[in-house]
């Protein structure tokens, strides 16, 4: 899994005002990998938690692996560095360990005030979704004319300038990843492809493809999700395996990914869950356990992003 810690804390959908304490709790529990994104609008809180623990002497910056993501409205080459610097300013960091292209799809660029301002107090944060999700009269996203291969060139420049140590992608299908890897003049391969992955969407083919190309896989939503009525925590197979190992269902779901050589980034703001989710290195699932969990696959994707389905680079029109 390269230099990426096997388990990280995701700040996706984390309740505003509670992220800083969650990050501090996570560092105390042993987390060193933190995953965030401009689109989550909580980079500032993540950074505050990190700075507090560094100031305490609990951890050093070089011990941490901090990842964030380029949003779709900033795929134009001239906007990539601006977007990265805005994230660094929000986090109050000098560099990122990993910067990801959040989706392969480029959207209409943001308001000029966003581009001109490197302050998080700009128009875009007063009306974040207006800027982040430009919609047409049919409530479908307005695309840009960008190509993610051009965006990648600007991402590579960030490595050269030292703003980021590694670059990667998220939500890319195998054809898109292959196109990127075959790009003439490629200077840096993506370190990882961050994808939705859980027992109802095992992503066997995409994981195999990525790993065969020496691109690691990072699993988001590893516990599924209860809001869509898909609660893996209550799945009887998962509960039975958890009982057999004396572990929680969440720990089984996280360990499942680790044994596939997949990096995993569960999210939580609850101290007990944060601690529990990283206590997954003192047991192993049997091959029988792994096979039973893999058999739960339904190819059920939760993060469909339907307002983008007409985009030329929508990633989910093919099987993987």
Swiss-Prot record:
Enzyme active site: 40
GO molecular function: 1,5-anhydro-D-fructose reductase activity; aldose reductase (NADPH) activity; oxidoreductase activity
Site entry: Lowers pKa of active site Tyr: 69
Compartments it resides in: Cytoplasm
CDD domains the record matches: AKR_AKR1E1-2 (cd19110)
GO CC annotation: cytosol
Catalytic activity: 1,5-anhydro-D-glucitol + NADP(+) = 1,5-anhydro-D-fructose + NADPH + H(+)
Binding site for substrate: 102
Keywords (A to Z) from UniProt: Cytoplasm, NADP, Oxidoreductase
Binding site for NADP(+): 35, 194, 265-277
Class of the enzyme per the UniProt entry, highest EC level: oxidoreductase
Tissues expressing the protein: Specifically expressed in testis. Expressed in testicular germ cells and testis interstitial cells.
EC number: 1.1.1.263
Keyword field contains Cytoplasm: yes
Regulation: Inhibited by p-chloromercuribenzoic acid and alkyliodines.
Subunit structure: Monomer.
Family to which the UniProt record says this protein belongs: Belongs to the aldo/keto reductase family.
Known role: Catalyzes the NADPH-dependent reduction of 1,5-anhydro-D-fructose (AF) to 1,5-anhydro-D-glucitol. Has low NADPH-dependent reductase activity towards 9,10-phenanthrenequinone (in vitro).
Name of protein: 1,5-anhydro-D-fructose reductase
Lineage: Eukaryota, Metazoa, Chordata, Craniata, Vertebrata
Gene name per UniProt: AKR1E2
């Amino acid at each position: 899994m390269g230099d990426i810690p096997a388990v990280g804390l995701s700040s996706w959908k984390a309740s505003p005002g509670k992220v800083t304490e969650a990050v501090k709790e996570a560092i105390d529990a042993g987390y060193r990998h933190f995953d965030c994104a401009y689109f989550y609008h909580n980079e500032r809180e993540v950074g505050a938690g990190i700075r507090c623990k560094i100031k305490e002497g609990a951890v050093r910056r070089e011990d941490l692996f901090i990842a964030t993501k380029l949003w779709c409205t900033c795929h134009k080459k001239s906007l990539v560095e601006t977007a990265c610097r805005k994230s660094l300013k929000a986090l109050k960091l000098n560099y990122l360990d990993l910067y990801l292209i959040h989706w392969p799809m480029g959207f209409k660029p943001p308001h000029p005030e966003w581009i001109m301002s490197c302050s998080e107090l700009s128009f875009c944060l007063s009306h974040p979704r207006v800027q982040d999700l430009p919609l047409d009269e049919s409530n479908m996203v307005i695309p840009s004319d960008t190509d993610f291969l051009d965006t990648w060139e600007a991402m590579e420049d960030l490595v050269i300038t030292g703003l980021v140590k590694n670059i990667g992608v998220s939500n890319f299908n195998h054809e898109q990843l292959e196109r990127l890897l075959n790009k003439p003049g490629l200077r840096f391969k993506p370190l990882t492809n961050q994808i939705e992955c859980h027992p109802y969407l095992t992503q066997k083919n995409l994981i195999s493809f990525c790993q065969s190309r020496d691109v690691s896989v990072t699993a988001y939503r590893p516990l599924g999700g209860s809001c869509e009525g898909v609660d893996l925590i209550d799945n009887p197979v998962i509960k039975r395996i958890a009982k057999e190992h004396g572990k929680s269902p969440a720990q089984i779901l996280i360990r499942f990914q680790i044994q596939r050589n997949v990096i995993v980034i569960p999210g939580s703001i609850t101290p007990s869950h944060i601690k529990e989710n990283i206590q997954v290195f003192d047991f192993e699932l049997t091959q029988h356990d792994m096979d039973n969990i893999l058999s739960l696959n339904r190819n059920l994707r939760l993060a469909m992003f339907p307002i983008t389905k007409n985009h030329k680079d929508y990633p989910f029109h093919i099987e993987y």
